[in-house]
Regions:
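Conserved small/polar residues in nucleotide/adenosyl-binding loops
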Residues: 8-9
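Cys/His-coordinated zinc-binding microdomains
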Residues: 22, 41
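A general "terminal functional-core" signal
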Residues: 37, 43-54, 126-436
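N-terminal low-complexity, Ser/Thr- and acidic-residue-enriched intrinsically disordered segments
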Residues: 46-110
Length: 436
């Protein structure tokens, strides 16, 4: 009995040919749809998930130095290790400094040269690893005539070990992408690479921006694109993923989709609906976006876009500065809400390798909880919803205000913030984007 491609029964196509298997609508298939056409009855489905996670204590100490998120990486890694989630992974991904040639696969040569250049005063007065916990508030920043040209001012000022930070942050996502490429060639299982060190989506080709000194996202997508084929990038950060969008705005092999807060004066000020075009999709939201609205967007807008594009890999930036408890207080998302949306994608595109990256998140303990919870969910840990007293570990004191508990009255549900994203507003976005 011949099967037919079922893609059309779920998501309308612009043409009478399946965007994935290239066969005519409802016609008997001459051959099965290749992955990722999960809607074809004869498509091979992944029966198992393999999860790999980036891990490096030395990289953690260096990433802890990022001025906008001092000490955050230690909280994230510490909580993941406290719940023994590393032991449940199929393997870890090493992080060793990226070489200049890796960085210049996207970034401008002179920009990279300036990032890697010596900053004698800063580095002389700060041991690169052993004193990562030192307070840098009173450190006098070296002035350099080129800093302003390359965006190293204001929210991206130079800090000790900047060169090593750039190399390790880039390497975390580069190596995660390489792990995916390697594993895809060796197994039919779904491959998930988790990298909470990465997700610096604002950095541009020739200048730093928005706390982002290197665009590890772009560097990793380029590896996936060159080795596997088309890539779909989904950005869940509160802020528009402008750096990644700009990198691929003329690419036919990379589609970008950013769900973000958009308003006058809200950083970075880009990402309007009207700026969307084929393979560049912006979903600007109003204040108060909650779990149900986010999941609706994922199901009704993002999923059709992914299916129509037919990617060979998916990259998700999981910035969680949209949490109700984040200092921005612009969205009303919960930890479980982020999990529900991300898990829906992982489950419904289970034959596609997926990379999960970090990003924003400025309530550091809640960010650590969110990414630990997401890691546990990806691994299929059954008791994550009932986690209570936090396991003993070296960063436990950071959670004193929470009563040393994972779930509290504050993070187990949304706040009273109103969701200003009406059904009509979201449907207008859906209609516009699916018509491109």
């Amino acid at each position: 009995m011949n099967s037919v491609c079922l893609l059309y029964t779920i998501y309308p196509q612009k043409e009478n040919v399946c965007s994935v298997c290239k066969q005519k609508k409802n016609a008997p298939q001459k051959k099965p749809c290749p992955p990722p056409c999960k809607y074809c009855q004869t498509s091979p489905m992944a029966t198992k998930r393999k999860v790999y996670i980036t891990l490096s204590e030395s990289a953690t100490k260096i990433v802890d130095l990022l001025p906008s998120n001092k000490g955050r990486q230690s909280l994230v890694l510490g909580l993941i290790e406290a719940y023994k989630l590393i032991d449940l992974c199929d393997g870890t991904i090493d992080i060793y400094p990226a070489q200049t040639k890796d960085l210049t696969t996207y970034h401008d040569d002179e920009f990279v040269k300036h990032l890697m250049g010596p900053r004698t005063f800063l580095d002389k007065n700060f041991n690169k690893i052993d004193k990562a916990e030192t307070d840098l508030t009173n450190v006098v920043i070296e002035e350099n005539d080129l800093d302003e040209k390359y965006g190293l001012t204001f929210d991206c000022y130079p800090f000790p070990s900047l060169d090593l930070y750039v190399q390790l942050t880039a390497a975390s996502s580069i190596n995660a992408a390489r792990k995916i490429v390697q594993q895809v060639k060796e197994t039919n299982d779904q491959i998930i690479a988790v990298n909470w060190y990465g997700g610096r989506h604002h950095c541009h080709k020739s200048h730093a921006a928005g706390f982002c000194y290197v665009n590890d996202v772009v560097l990793s997508i380029n590896i996936l694109r060159k080795n596997l084929g088309s890539v779909f990038y989904l950005d869940l950060d509160l802020h528009h993923g402008d750096g990644v969008e700009n990198a691929f705005k003329f690419s036919k092999k990379v589609a970008t989709c950013s769900i973000h807060r958009y308003d006058i004066g809200f950083y970075p000020g880009t990402g309007s609906l009207k700026s969307s075009r084929e393979n560049t999709y912006n979903i600007p939201t109003e204040k108060g976006l909650n779990d149900s609205s986010m999941l609706w967007i994922i199901k009704e807008i993002v999923a059709p876009l992914i299916s129509n594009f037919g990617p060979r890999a998916i990259v998700i930036q999981c910035g969680c500065d949209g949490l109700a408890l984040d200092t921005h207080k612009e969205w009303n998302m919960t930890i479980k809400g982020y999990r529900d949306s991300i898990d829906w994608i992982l489950s419904h595109f289970s034959e596609i390798p997926i990379m999960l990256l970090g990003g924003g998140g400025y309530s550091h303990t809640e960010t650590a909880k969110c990414w630990t919870y997401l890691t546990g969910s990806v691994l299929g840990v059954s008791d994550i919803d009932t986690w209570d007293i936090l396991p003993e570990h070296k960063n436990l004191d950071a959670y004193e205000k929470d009563g040393f508990r994972f779930w509290t009255d504050h993070n187990s549900g949304p706040s009273k913030m109103k969701d200003h994203n009406s059904v009509e507003y979201l449907n207008d976005i859906k209609t516009h984007l699916l018509s491109l």
